[in-house]
Amino acid sequence: MSSGASFIFLFFFLTSFTASVENVFYIKHICPNTTTYSRNSPYLTNLRTLLSSLSAPNASYSTGFQSARAGQAPDRVTGLFLCRGDVSPAVCRNCVAFSINDTLVQCPSERKSVFYYDECMLRYSDQNILSTLAYDGAWIRMNGNISIDQNQMNRFKDFVSSTMNQAAVKAASSPRKFYTVKATWTALQTLYGLVQCTPDLTRQDCFSCLESSIKLMPLYKTGGRTLYSSCNSRYELFAFYNETTVRTQQAPPPLPPSSTPLVTSPSLPGKSWNSNVLVVAIVLTILVAALLLIAGYCFAKRVKNSSDNAPAFDGDDITTESLQLDYRMIRAATNKFSENNKIGQGGFGEVYKGTFSNGTEVAVKRLSKSSGQGDTEFKNEVVVVAKLQHRNLVRLLGFSIGGGERILVYEYMPNKSLDYFLFDPAKQNQLDWTRRYKVIGGIARGILYLHQDSRLTIIHRDLKASNILLDADMNPKLADFGLARIFGMDQTQENTSRIVGTFGYMAPEYAIHGQFSVKSDVYSFGVLVLEIISGKKNNSFYETDGAHDLVTHAWRLWSNGTALDLVDPIIIDNCQKSEVVRCIHICLLCVQEDPAERPILSTIFMMLTSNTVTLPVPLQPGFPVQS
């Protein structure tokens, strides 16, 4: 084949994989040039055959692993792909397609390579790599520069090591060689771990690989991972994998019937027949129960947006098509947007409680028609928000642009919003200090995810008590992303001439100059936590000291050494006063006038969860601008 024809073939070969690729997160690739091939060599032909096999429509995307060989020695090529155990077949396929495209561009002449992505790994070599343990291609990463507090470091390292090694034992014994683990570190911090081997390894080789990878991880940080070409391990203090998927995968099998053995007696008339009937009956019972469980699971996963069903979506499968719901279904669920179903109203529209025909309850937000945003932009933003998967964010289930309206459908929160309890004298007593402190930590976790842990940096811009919803267990979830802005990878600040949000919560630089950043969210967080501590709205202070807002009042009490006078009388006698004062201190750091002096959310979270972190002296606050 001529070089020109070869180039044309390669071009079409590459472009054939790019159509369906979306949202693949590249990590690293390794392709040593110790052995290479020429453009016209048999090895390239075999490599193309191998990659075509791995990316075929019928490849094993549902299991997340496939291996293949092509050609004869010395030009034989062996390869495999391994997708992360919690991703969907669609995401697996996209990642494999992307990696194949990347491989032929980044390693155009190397005879071996390994490509790592967050969602998958692709590997090929001129040596046999199947069912063979390999420690090459190692890559180690820590989660930024955030370290666990020095006094707790050894205990944390032991905790992570023990938890991850337990997961390694489970993974090595499982058919898919994959396992996730979730363990409580503190009242506000949960450890999430994931370990995985290529399924062609033996149990012992898988455990040896994972054990080595865990030893290499920087266990003194708040997160870390090790990637080998045969296995990988990762831990974080946030949920980085799809909990819903792994919960289903790792669910224990149904309990077997009583283990009492059947006793056979000598052949008496009718006895043998009765025993056989009994055995068949038991087996059929077990099979029917198993089939019902499988059918129920499949039904829950495959429910579509039809007039008879509620939406059900998995984070990795989210597309515009999967999110779009039938307007008539939503209208019926809200009883034609009945006033009796209305549960709230804000600047961007009305909120209704909806109940689908299968009993699923949802919150339906009917957006006002004043927005100038086009349908395409609206759909794109909906998909972005829907992909934000965190336990402290309200989950967006779908949308509709039917009937001349724009509608958002969220998961339903039975306990309404934080302000419903916090500012009602009759309900305040349901929020003791323990519960309030838990709410504060949950809000911090949600903002931290938006600012740092999600793939996009997102500024909420409207953090306030009414936008913190509470689930059945009073866990907080951030809601209402109508004003949220997405920042680019290197972007730290943005200006706007359109000041939107809620006065009293807005950082001064935003309210006055239109400048917003992660630090403007930090300011709003500080005001919100002061409200949680005091039980009073930020704009309802008309005290004897002349303060007309909560920040001014808190600053004056702090300066006078009487910070505890800020605390809600309902909780003052049943709280850890040192803990409350520390929270007030953190709030005052958040509302400092100079945005550069305000801590970022990861630092704030460390301050909240570790009493050994020294807090700096707060400087003059930026007093809120009132409407």
Curated annotation (Swiss-Prot):
PROSITE patterns: GNK2, PROTEIN_KINASE_ATP, PROTEIN_KINASE_DOM, PROTEIN_KINASE_ST. The chain crosses the membrane at residues 277-297. It comes from Arabidopsis thaliana (Mouse-ear cress). One of its GO terms (molecular function) is protein serine/threonine kinase activity. GO terms for cellular component: membrane. The keyword Repeat applies. SUPFAM superfamilies: Protein kinase-like (PK-like). It catalyses: L-seryl-[protein] + ATP = O-phospho-L-seryl-[protein] + ADP + H(+); L-threonyl-[protein] + ATP = O-phospho-L-threonyl-[protein] + ADP + H(+). ATP binds at residues 343-351, 365. Keywords: ATP-binding, Glycoprotein, Kinase, Membrane, Nucleotide-binding, Phosphoprotein, Receptor, Repeat, Serine/threonine-protein kinase, Signal, Transferase, Transmembrane, Transmembrane helix. Belongs to the protein kinase superfamily. Ser/Thr protein kinase family. CRK subfamily. Residues 25-129, 136-240 form the Gnk2-homologous domain. Residues 1-20 form the signal peptide. Residues 337-623 form the Protein kinase domain. SMART domains: S_TKc. PANTHER family: CYSTEINE-RICH RECEPTOR-LIKE PROTEIN KINASE 10-RELATED, RECEPTOR-LIKE SERINE/THREONINE-PROTEIN KINASE SD1-8. The modification Phosphoserine is found at residue 466. Its EC number is 2.7.11.-. It holds the Pfam family Stress-antifung. Residues 21-276 are extracellular. It is a single-pass membrane protein. This is Cysteine-rich receptor-like protein kinase 15. The active site is at 462 (proton acceptor). Glycans are attached at residues 33, 58, 101, 145, 242. The modification Phosphothreonine is found at residue 502.
